[in-house]
Amino acid sequence: QKRVRDYLGKILSSSNHLLSLINDILDMSRIESGKIHLEETEVSLSDVLHDLKTIISGQIHAKQLELYMDAMDVTNEDVYCDKTRLNQVLLNLLSNAVKFTPAGGTVSVRLKQLPGTAKGSALYEIRVKDNGIGMSQEFVKKIFSPFERERTSTVSRTQGTGLGMAITKNIVDMMGGTIEVQTAQGKGTEFIVRLPFRIQPEQHRIEKIAELEGLKALVVDDDFDTCDSVTKMLVRVGMRSEWTLSGREAVLRVRQSMELGDAFHAYIIDWCLPDMNGIEVTRQIRSLGDDTPIIILTAYDWSDIEAEAKAAGVTAFCAKPLFMSDIRDTLMTAIGQNQAEQEKPVPVSYTHLR
């Protein structure tokens, strides 16, 4: 039975590899003959990145890599674009990063909306970075040419047609964007893609929410950019926001706010903090008698920690990369749930009323 399973696994792996080679060749052929056309539809960039994370997670776990995904300053997450081709570009870049990063390495994807575009459109920058084997400057000059692969012992052992980057470059060009690469042998590689998209109409934009307006939140994350980004999102929905990079500082802020009578209405805490994790921060906040909603941010699958987190007093989870719609929906649910709990009638015991 074990031998049969091994054979079936090898057959499946070989079949998938052969299929990917054929698809690359067909795509390149269609591109060169002008038969590929973009089909724009309504697309949520939040969905694109969360789906990408789901698709690539198997490869990430198989190679024991760390994957970090983030979204910065994205005020327009609903756009018009060819979702299939955008996914193809991102998967090509991310799969390459995984492929050429040794076990224990780190791969990151960061999406940022750039300022200064014409009304009705927006420019987005996507950076895919790894700390893998990198590339020589000689190879970088021809990386976007068809069938080109770097001739090193490490790369030669890695499967591929050498068409992925050529296809990616052609799709980016068709979308009216640009792609560049920064790399050094032994230090890793970063691909930087900039793409212009038409944004969806005004009714899709996030406005201030009456139920959240004026409420105060504390953001706790050891990454300054995340604190800054989440704070901007909270201000956009009408909340007041403070932030700190430390779990211990967060607990101190909570204690001070309670003593001053200016308590927080929500806590947004990263799971992986350097001084104490988000669950321990939650325990310490709850030990102060504070029942304010606590939302844990995590770039990982939270199923393994969910029971422990709930027992510690965590109200809800929110997955990175974090978008406006994610934080808005999670806040509305968490704060609404907390208010409902407070409004429940207190059960009366008749035992001592005889």
PLM features: residue spans?
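Helix-loop junction within the histidine kinase core
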Residues: S29-E40
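Disordered, acidic interdomain junction associated with two-component signaling
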Residues: G58, A62, D70, A118-G120, ...
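Short conserved segment of the HATPase_c
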Residues: M135-R149
